[in-house]
Design a protein with these regions (language model features):
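An N-terminal, well-structured beta->alpha segment
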Residues: 3-105, 112, 194-230, 240
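Gly/Ser/Thr-enriched, mixed-charge loops and adjacent short helices
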Residues: 14-15, 19, 36-45, 155-282, ...
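Conserved phosphate/anionic-ligand binding catalytic regions in large, soluble enzymes, centered on
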Residues: 41-61, 145-146, 232, 236-244, ...
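N-terminal small/polar loop signature for handling phosphorylated ligands or for N-terminal nucleophile
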Residues: 89-152, 250-251, 255-310
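Active-site phosphate-binding/coordination module
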Residues: 127-185, 303, 314
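Phosphate-binding and adjacent anionic-ligand microenvironments
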Residues: 291, 296-297, 337-520, 527-531, ...
Length: 559
């Protein structure tokens, strides 16, 4: 601890000598707060496979113009080793300092003689992935902290195929970043100068319309029954997906009512506890609006437009679905559509993460397609799609339990815009068949099995929290529960040692005959996450298995 304290105070002094303006004032206010100085300076904000993610503020362990500039200089050095004249697209969401950080990154890249395409307005993450592919750039950056609380921001890097950087590339970029001093090594030129010299070009409406044209063509090709369309209430949760979600739903002929209070950018997310469509609280105003207009479907996207949550009006009561349930319905719906209109072929495939429901496996088997699995994180799904793109195997659908979905070939990251359209089209087809989504899901369970899932997270902040998370993971590896309920432990999979073709990762999977229990530290938050996956013969049995797994988790975290 003494070495950590010494390092933190040495770096604090270095920052005091070099920063100015508001950040200098913020530093001076910390001078008597040892705990805060240690938390802000005990390490560098890590550039992991999620890029940078952290609280906004001064410090080496915070998101600010210095950490952004250093990361971007490292990224520039990496790119210039790959290619002589690289180019990069940069997008940003509605969070505090997102535009500032995007401009900082663009000025650093421009100073390194890298051509930058910078969005002239907020843009969702899937549009960034699309733009990288459309403009054939060598990479992309999006400034976002997704659905984290308002005090956070982040910085994600994309490779030339529009996929978020997987560990191989992230590690190479990290190696370049770690060579750099925060204050001496980052090149930068003024924004206006870079615009004048055409090192920075601004992207405007055309790329939005190109995206809408692309996904509209795909969606109309599904030839879904849309005789009856639900009235839709939509909230972007103050985020960047508003223009594209309303744009595609309008093109498809849906009547959409907005939650006006949440439709203008607000970096404080004022009416929300957290801007996360996985949370019931995020739907409070949307459900109020839905009752007023008698909406059949309620949609919410997160601030960077890559995740979506839904509610359905079921006999006058609004009920929600998990990310797994929506993924199962969309999988079955799309497979039906592909079989109906374009004949499925051997080798066609669905992609999901290891922590996502196994219910799609019997569905895929019936349709004669393959289920490919990846580690947690949509970047691995994007990587898998890219791997098979020239193999003759057709990508049908990819999803993860955390409310992220992708269909079509336009992007390589989860896309709440195309998902919003697909969910609305699927709901329309069900209505045209005199069915609700709830009834559709019930039919699927009766046919394919009563699978159940639950995510349980524990938050442990700061240095002490990181140590606690390490102890919990060690316990899962070395001393896991030998029984859950009446079921013996069959197998322990430690992905850190390397499992099959999966890259090494700090993930442990415990397999029991009807239960899977998977633990991993979050890559973007100070949390450890446990995923319970069960396969019951009835709904009641599935719920009982989940309860027994929860008891086992309580035992594991008690270290």
């Amino acid at each position: 601890m003494d070495k950590i304290r010494e390092r933190a105070f040495n770096i604090y002094e270095e920052w005091l000598e070099n920063v100015n303006g508001e950040l200098k004032e913020e530093l001076l206010k910390l001078k008597d707060d040892e705990e805060e100085i240690i938390d802000r300076f005990y390490k560098d904000l890590e550039f992991g496979t999620g890029g940078l993610r952290g609280k906004i503020g001064v410090g080496s362990n915070r998101m600010n113009i210095y950490t952004v500039a250093r990361a971007t200089q490292g990224y520039a050095n990496y790119l210039k080793k790959q290619k002589d004249f690289p180019s990069v697209v940069i997008a940003y969401d509605t969070r505090k300092n997102s535009e500032l950080f995007a401009k900082t990154a663009s000025m650093v890249l421009a100073a390194n003689d890298i051509n930058v395409f910078l969005f002239d307005q907020v843009a969702p993450t899937p549009l960034l992935s699309f733009a990288v592919r459309k403009l054939k750039t060598d990479g992309g950056i999006v400034i976002t902290a997704s659905h984290n609380p308002p005090e956070y921001n982040g910085y994600k890097v994309y490779t030339s195929d529009g996929t978020q950087a997987v560990p191989k590339y992230a590690n190479e970029i990290t190696a370049e970043i770690e060579k750099l001093n925060y204050f001496k090594d980052s090149k930068i030129i003024p924004f206006e100068e870079a615009l004048k010299n055409e090192k920075i070009s601004l992207l405007s409406e055309e790329i939005f319309n190109d995206y809408l044209d692309e996904i509209e063509g795909y969606l109309r090709g599904l030839n879904a029954l849309m005789d009856i369309k639900p009235i839709i209430v939509y909230t972007p949760l103050y985020g960047a997906a508003l223009k594209l979600v309303t744009g595609i739903l309008s093109r498809l002929g849906f009547e959409v009512f907005l939650v006006e209070e949440q439709s203008k950018p607000d970096s404080n997310f004022s009416t929300l506890k957290v801007p996360n469509p996985e949370e019931k609280s995020a739907f409070e105003l949307a459900l109020k609006k839905a009752k007023e207009v008698k909406a059949g479907l309620v949609l919410a996207t997160d601030p960077d437009g890559d995740r979506i949550g839904i509610y359905e009006n079921y006999n006058g009561e609004y009920i929600t679905f998990t990310g797994n349930q929506v993924g199962v319905m969309l999988t079955h719906f799309l497979l039906c559509k592909f079989r109906e209109y374009s004949s499925l072929k051997v080798g066609d495939y669905i992609v999901k993460t290891i922590v996502t429901t196994d219910m799609v496996k019997p569905i895929a088997e019936e349709f004669g397609v393959t289920v490919e699995e990846t580690l947690t994180g949509f970047k691995y799904i994007g990587e898998k799609i890219e791997k098979y793109k020239n193999s003759g195997r057709r990508f049908i659908f990819g999803f993860e339990e955390s409310y992220g979905y992708l269909a079509n070939d336009h992007a390589r990251d989860k896309d709440a815009i195309i998902a919003a359209a697909l969910i609305s089209i699927m709901a329309s087809e069900m209505l045209s068949k005199r069915k609700t989504l709830s009834e559709y899901l019930k039919d699927l369970k009766e046919k394919y099995g009563y699978y159940g899932e639950k995510l349980i997270s524990f938050e442990f902040e700061g240095f002490e929290g990181a140590q606690k998370i390490n102890r919990i993971m060690n316990k899962m590896r070395k001393n896991p529960p030998v029984k859950i309920g009446e079921y013996d432990l069959l197998e322990t999979l430690d992905y850190l040692k390397g499992i099959e073709e999966f890259p090494k990762s700090d993930v442990v999977e415990l397999r029991y005959s009807k239960i899977k229990l998977i633990g991993r530290p979050s890559g973007t938050e100070p949390k450890i996450k446990f995923y319970i996956l069960v396969d019951g013969s009835t709904e009641d049995e599935a719920q009982q298995l989940i309860k027994e797994a929860e008891s086992a988790i309580s035992e594991i975290v008690n270290v």
